[in-house]
Regions:
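A short beta-turn/loop motif at secondary-structure boundaries
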Residues: 47-51, 113, 245
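Glycine- and acidic-residue-biased ligand/ion/polar-headgroup-sensing regions
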Residues: 52-54, 60-89, 124-125
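Conserved short histidine dyad/triad with adjacent acidic residue
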Residues: 15-17, 37-70
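A short, structural micro-pattern
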Residues: 50, 71-73, 94, 115
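Conserved hydrophobic/aromatic beta-strand scaffold that supports enzyme active sites
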Residues: 48, 56-58, 76-78, 99-101, ...
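Alpha-helical bundle regulatory/interaction domains
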Residues: 1-30, 35-39, 86-239, 244
């Protein structure tokens, strides 16, 4: 019989997923549904690191998948993408310098191609505000409305991703650092806040092109059709039904 999990096991969770129906396993801060889009053996890895009140979540996939993800109440999400990541977020193609900010309970649709890596930073909004207020920078605080794509200097966004990836690599090799030493979790969270806020300071609202807007509109149409189909279990659906949605 397996004993009670150690502090290190609670702080660092690694989940390897081969079945998309298990996509929500071991990730209590996110609600996630996934669909595999290629008929080959799937290998998705998720690493979650719990800091004092924040969390860092790493995802990678070897195949094309589509997910619907939302952050549970009480957290804001900031998502960065690896240098080899190809795909879309809410229909918007992932590209260098792109950063996504999302409020809690806001569903986002993501299509990830094979070789994808992303890191999601989850933080309580009151912690961000407290961090800024202590440094007399409270005016910088902004709660995203829905899902906000942001654009910044690609090098700045890359540094944020690299910081998160280094944290993940450290947690994989030395999980006890985060589970047994509160000082390490506190230091990591403070460094996360400084690194994230430094990136947000140089970020602007994303200026979408006409092609971007077309892709985003198509994404909304697909999502609406899927929602309708899922609400009609067991019924035979026709294209004319979807046209009425």
């Amino acid at each position: 019989m397996k004993g009670k999990p150690t502090a290190a096991e609670n702080a660092v969770t690694v989940v390897d997923i081969s079945d998309p129906t298990a996509a929500n396993t071991g990730v209590e801060l996110l609600d996630l549904d996934a669909v595999q889009l290629q008929s080959l053996p799937l290998r998705v890895r998720r690493v979650m690191i719990r800091l004092e009140s924040a969390a860092v979540v790493f995802h990678s996939t070897n195949l094309r998948v589509r997910t619907r993800t939302s952050v549970r109440s009480g957290f804001l999400a900031y998502v960065t993408f690896g240098p080899q990541a190809h795909g879309t977020i809410n229909g918007l193609p992932v590209r260098p310098g792109l950063l996504l900010a999302a409020e809690s309970e806001m569903e986002n649709t993501l299509v990830a191609e094979g070789g994808w890596e992303s890191i999601t930073f989850l933080l309580p909004p009151e912690d961000i505000l407290a961090h800024l207020t202590a440094r007399q920078r409270a005016a910088e605080f902004h709660v995203p409305e829905g899902a906000e794509p942001l654009q910044a200097d690609p090098e700045s966004v890359r540094r944020l991703f690299d910081w998160g990836k280094l944290l993940v690599d450290t947690a994989l090799f030395q999980p006890a650092l985060f589970g047994e030493q509160m000082k390490e979790r506190v230091n990591a969270q403070n460094e996360l806040l400084e690194t994230l806020l430094a990136t947000l300071r140089v970020a602007d609202g994303f200026e979408s092109t006409r092609n971007d807007r077309t892709r985003q509109a198509q994404s909304v149409i697909v999502k609406t059709a899927e929602d309708y189909a899922m609400a009609q279990p067991g019924d035979r659906l026709y294209v004319t039904d979807l046209c009425k949605v």
